[in-house]
Amino acid sequence: MNLHEYQGKQLFAEYGLPVSKGFAVDTPEAAAEACDKIGGSEWVVKAQVHAGGRGKAGGVKLVRSKEDAKAFAAQWLGKRLVTYQTDANGQPVTKILVESCTDIAKELYLGAVVDRSSRRIVFMASTEGGVDIEKVAHETPEKIIKATIDPLVGAQPFQGRELAFQLGLEGKQVAQFAKIFVGLAKLFKEHDLALLEVNPLVIKADGDLHCLDAKINIDANAMYRQPKLKTFHDPSQDDPREAHAASFELNYVALEGNIGCMVNGAGLAMGTMDIVNLHGGKPANFLDVGGGATKERVTEAFKIILSDSNVAAVLVNIFGGIVRCDMIAEGIIGAVKEVGVKVPVVVRLEGNNAELGAKVLAESGLNIIAATSLTDAAQQVVKAAEGK
C-alpha cells in the first residue's frame, strides 16, 4: 500500500525527522488558510497522487501569494494528474499539500528496501538526488552507496556516519545524517515497510539537512498488524479493477497488452506472461486466482479481465494440484455462459483430472480452444488475439 507524501511526512515528523511545515487541504479556501498558518511569503503547493513526475506534469508549483495557492488548488482538486508513471487517464487529485519554501543548496538521495538476496533491509544513498534512482543505478551505479542493516541489532549510528562521509558531508551534517538514517530505519521496521525514499534529502542554504520528499510503500501482507496505517489508505488512487479483484481474493494487476491471462499461482502466472511475450503477444494483465479457485472466483476473474476493452483473447492456464481440473473446467464453462464472453478463450489444463477437464471443455459446445501444452497455449492465444 502506498502513502501520499503528506502522510509519509507525518510519519517522519513522529520520528523526529526534519520536514517542512505543511498542511494537506481539500478546498481552495483551505489552501489560502494554510499559507496564513505557515507564514512567510513563499510556499510550495503539491498535488497529492501515488505517482512520481508530478513537477514536470505541473503538479508542483512555487507560489508567492495566497491567491496563487488558492488558484492552484482550484485548478487541480477534482481533476486527474497525468505523469510518466501513470496511465493515460492519470490519477485523481483529492488533496493538495501546502508547505513552507526551502532554500536548497544541494540534493541527495536516501532510500531503503528489503533486499531479497541478503534477506535484510538495505539502505542506499547517493549524491545524485532529485532524479530516479533507477536511472542512477543504470547509468552511474558507482554513485550509489549501501548499508545493510543487521536485523538483530538494527541500524547503528556509525553506519549513518560512514554513509555521510562517503556522501561528502561534514561537520554538523554528519550527526544530522546519522540521526535521519537511524530514524528512518526504525520507521521502516516498526511499520513493516517494503520501500522508503527521501528524494531529495537536501542540504539547505544554512547547511542543515532536510527531508524534502517522502515516498513510502507498506508491505500489504503486514497490514493486519498496522491498524493505524490502514486508515491512511486512499481508495481513489486504486485501479477499480484491482480493488474489485481484491474483494474476491484475486491478485490482479492491469497491464497494457491485449491478451487476458487467468492463472492459478503467482509463479505460474509470471511464467505464463513470459511465454506469451516470447511468442510475440502482450499480456493485458497479471491475474492469480489462487489455489482455491471456485466457479464464482473464475466468473469474477473473467468479468475483471473483460472489463478491459483492449482484451482480444483470454488465456486460462491452470495446474490442478489441490483443485481438480474438471471442476475448473466446469467453472470456466459456467463463467463463459454467464459473462457472455465474445473473445476467443484458450485453455490449458495440467495435473489433477486434466484429461477429464479437457473432455468437459470439448463437450461443452462453446468456442473454447483446448491447448496441449503451455507453448501451444501461448501460440494459440497470440494467433487468436491477432484474428488469425
Curated annotation (Swiss-Prot):
Cofactor(s) needed: Mg(2+)
S-S bonds: none
SUPFAM superfamilies: Glutathione synthetase ATP-binding domain-like, Succinyl-CoA synthetase domains
Binding site for ATP: 46, 53-55, 99, 102, 107
EC top class, as a word: ligase
Catalytic activity from the UniProt record: succinate + ATP + CoA = succinyl-CoA + ADP + phosphate; GTP + succinate + CoA = succinyl-CoA + GDP + phosphate
Binding site residues for Mg(2+): 199, 213
Family named by the database record: Belongs to the succinate/malate CoA ligase beta subunit family.
Name the UniProt record assigns to this protein: Succinate--CoA ligase [ADP-forming] subunit beta
